[in-house]
């Protein structure tokens, strides 16, 4: 059955496969899972992928960025200070990427995050720090990608420029383009934007030899995806994909946070919903409790001094049981099953044909989720891959394939949503149906003029599954101009859709009579312009320079502290160094300490003070060593003379 299907698929997707394998990538290729809550990076070691540890020693890095004065913090450092700096600490920004400000999901998020979300000049949703400076979601994502790039470079010992970046399978065109923009801003050449479940399937099936049909259930920090894939003879073919780009661990945290807020209000009468710092503490406590309830039946939530009233300090103290949390999250778990049903239907497979259900994403550790998946698919899910690392491992594997380091593996992915144009009467005419294997290209001639002597035609591109164009998401629009005057309906306009392996779409309109063409790359009706991306790259580079200078100053401070401590210890141990020399060291030590305490000291100034101290200590150390050696030599000589005298006396006595 599998071989027959794949032979058919192979013939249908021959052009796609040829384009997919058309060019070999040179240089290192890293795989990055840019997650909503956590991100990680992997590289190929030989024929096996490996997830790398960051500078803090962890394999997963919080997808959190903060601004504190002129300082930019990324990862764990940013997350640790979120409670005291909630308005300038950005988390879960991936949920905003490629979205318009008026999007209903954005309006929902505005009420639930401590930082501000505002409308940018192009109409997209951007975040804003406490000083009023706006950042695009792509820019914030770029700061996280820079951290991943740095992690890989530290491990490899060389610069890295190529990356495979994963994204939710149900991301639309603008969201994929925004993800690629984030990589560009971070200084990366994003050679593929690959669906997370597809990457996880690569990690799962890399060492599998048996033909199989699998489902990948990916419930992460901010998004949910379900994909059905067929694996046979090294070919990974995605049959169908579905999902919800606004369902994930953040929503589970939120439902538990709301419960804590409600219970606290019941017991104290105090509403904390408008207190940003308190909300951030509760959110962090909810996330911690959620994780603990995956392995324990109940957990304590204790937040001392959360607020105060006329009765004094108030504290959050409560016990949350697993059953209570599961009842709060029941609707969220059930929401994931709707896309599962649609995906199975679109893949045209029976549940009995699914031989394995692979769980991916941190939320799949929740017992309620595991049970729901088991009941839906009728089998115990496979939990043999690390749910936090599988996607990055798959990304690195795909990088190995593109470098031709990994042989005999082919990936055939799909576009998650239908793409088409608006035609007469506002109808949505599909050009590329959903779940079409990509890359793909399709042309169709159905446009013409609607009026006599009309010289231009407007093309509106939409993505979605509704029958009327207005009910779907408009991805972009452009005009084909210079059409020769002719009666209505005579000119023939050919429209071509061309989707890259990344899932990014290019649309071209051509007047068949004159050969004139006009094209557009689908980014978004807003999206980042080339100038904005270049400005953000410069901004990123300036941050990189300031970060480098800051790191160098920290290293110089650490060295100064070490030298100062050494000098203080030596001053108490020297026996042969003169008082004048000791006083000189004390003077230089005081100068070094003063420089260290100066918040505005430069690296060169502190280095100079440290070098003077170090040089003086070394001179005194040399004096100490020489004087001590001379003293030992004199003592040894005296002992030798005495011994010789005793031996002579003993000899005289023996002669007598």
Swiss-Prot record:
Gene Ontology biological process terms, A to Z: DNA replication
Transit peptide feature range: 1-23
Family, similarity comment: Belongs to the heat shock protein 70 family.
Chain's role: May participate in eukaryotic mitochondrial DNA replication.
Range of residues in the leader sequence: none
The keyword Magnesium belongs to this UniProt entry's keyword annotation: no
Superkingdom per UniProt: Eukaryota
Pfam families: HSP70
Keywords tagged on the record: ATP-binding, DNA replication, Kinetoplast, Mitochondrion, Nucleotide-binding, Stress response, Transit peptide
Keyword flag Nuclease: no
GO molecular function, one term: ATP binding
Sequence ranges of Low complexity compositional bias: 626-656
GO cellular component, one term: kinetoplast
Location relative to the cell: Mitochondrion matrix, Kinetoplast
Name of the protein in question: Heat shock 70 kDa protein, mitochondrial
Region (Disordered) location: 624-656
